[in-house]
Every structure is written in C-alpha cells, then in structure tokens.
Swiss-Prot record:
Subunit structure: Part of the 30S ribosomal subunit. Forms a tight complex with proteins S10 and S14.
CDD domains, sorted: KH-II_30S_S3 (cd02412)
Protein name (database record): Small ribosomal subunit protein uS3
MF (Gene Ontology): mRNA binding; rRNA binding; structural constituent of ribosome
GO CC terms: cytosolic small ribosomal subunit
UniProt similarity note: Belongs to the universal ribosomal protein uS3 family.
This protein's encoding gene: rpsC
Organism from which the protein derives: Shewanella oneidensis (strain ATCC 700550 / JCM 31522 / CIP 106686 / LMG 19005 / NCIMB 14063 / MR-1)
One GO term of the biological process aspect: translation
Domain KH type-2 per the UniProt entry, residue ranges: 39-107
Keyword entries, A-Z: Ribonucleoprotein, Ribosomal protein, RNA-binding, rRNA-binding
Job of this protein: Binds the lower part of the 30S subunit head. Binds mRNA in the 70S ribosome, positioning it for translation.
InterPro entries associated with the record: KH_dom, KH_dom-like_a/b, KH_dom_type_2, KH_sf_prok-type, Ribosomal_S3_C_sf, Ribosomal_uS3_bac-typ, Ribosomal_uS3_C, Ribosomal_uS3_CS
C-alpha cells in the first residue's frame, strides 16, 4: 500500500525547523510541553480570524517568547497594540513566566499550505463547489511562484451518500527528495453533510545551502562493434 510519511516530520532538522525551540531538564519538560499546548490552543481559538499559519515558541532564561506567523498582522495587533497586549498578559498567565509576543507577517499567503487549506475549508462551508475551490487555490499558488502544488479533499463531497477522495495537482511535488522545500498542512471543513478533510502540499523549490554541486562524470564511449564477416 502506498502510505505516505508526514512531509514535515521527515524533514525536521534537514530543511524544516522545530516550532518549539527550548531545552528543559526532566523535572520541567512535561510542564513546559503542557504549557506549550495550552498556549497554542488559546491563541488558535482567539485568532481564528487572523489567518495564523504557525506559532513558534521559545523559552530563553525563564521567560517565554511567542512568534505568531500571520497574513493579517493588523487583526492580531489591534488598535494601538491593545489586542496584542491582552494576548501577552494571557500567555504570561498560562505559562507562569514573563511573556513576549512577536508578529511575523506572511507576505505570500497563496504559498502557505495552512492558509491555503483553511481558505478551501471556508469556501466549502460557504457551499462553493469543491472542484472550483481546489482549482482556484492551485492556480493562485502557481501564479505566485510555486513549483508545484497538490490539493486533496476527502469526505461527502457535494453531499454525496458515499464518502470519497479527490485530488488535483499541478507542477511537481517530490515527496521523496529530502532537500525539497515542501510545505504540508491540513484543515477541516464542517458542512451540513459532515466533515470534509483538506490536505495541501506546496513545493517551493530545493534547499541547496551547504551542499556540494554534483558534477556529472563524462560517459565513456563504447567501442564500435565491427560488422560480422569482416
């Protein structure tokens, strides 16, 4: 069976960084991990309308630093920074340490797998045809500069009695190439017929930093065979 490994997990430490970067002793590790989970859950609930792609958590010197990657930084910051100050106080209370909130803007949301998946999910909830939503997402990504994109939707598509999966791909998406920069994410669309799952793979190019260029060896020409009888 053609089962696929998680594209982000297999590339951790190769082309993908971790989204939690801290070190802790055995006694503190479980508490920090639980604190990370609570902070992520709180921010995901609070910032549903802010097009948040990912949340990176660092813990320098008995404090917590949270970087929110979003396509709509104005929604996160609020008027004169009021909203971000509320978030900072809430994160500090959840983590039990001083907190710092940083905002990182995503300039090209069409090339972010999480934002593309969420966009398709919202369209399906508004009863847009799933094929049209998939095709629009693929065309936008390729127009902005993706080298390849694949979108898969699964569930009771179009209200069908039997659930099925359909996918659409353009360009190339090399899942086996570890140096390939592939952004992968999932989302769920809650429709009146049930839940529809969305998966998105976006291939942005190859990461070649620190790699030696491969020089092709010249092929040796085989001697020509003499015809028989001469």
């Amino acid at each position: 069976m053609g089962q696929k490994v998680h594209p982000n997990g297999i590339r951790l430490g190769i082309t993908k960084p971790w989204i939690s970067t801290w070190y802790a002793d055995k006694s503190d590790y479980a508490n920090n991990l639980n604190s990370d989970w609570e902070v992520r859950k709180y921010l995901a609930d609070k910032l549903q309308a802010a097009s948040v792609s990912k949340i990176v958590i660092e813990r320098p010197a008995k404090s917590i630093r949270v970087t929110i990657h979003t396509a709509r930084p104005g929604v996160v910051i609020g008027k004169k920074g009021e909203d971000v100050e509320v978030l900072r106080a809430a994160v500090s209370k959840l983590a039990g340490t001083p907190a710092q909130i940083n905002i990182a803007e995503i300039r090209k949301p069409e090339l972010d797998a999480k934002l593309v998946a969420d966009s398709i999910a919202q369209q399906l909830e508004r009863r847009v045809m799933f094929r049209r939503a998939m095709k629009r997402a693929v065309q936008n990504a390729m127009r902005i500069g993706a080298q390849g994109i694949k979108v898969e939707v699964s569930g009771r598509l179009g209200g069908a009695e039997i659930a099925r999966s359909e996918w659409y791909r353009e360009g190339r998406v090399p899942l086996h190439t570890l140096r390939a920069d592939i952004d992968y994410s999932t989302s769920e669309s809650h429709t009146q017929y049930g839940v529809i799952g969305i998966k998105v793979w976006i291939f942005k190019g190859e990461v070649l930093d620190g790699m030696l260029p491969q020089i092709e060896e010249p092929k040796q020409q085989q001697p020509k065979r003499k015809p028989r009888g001469k």
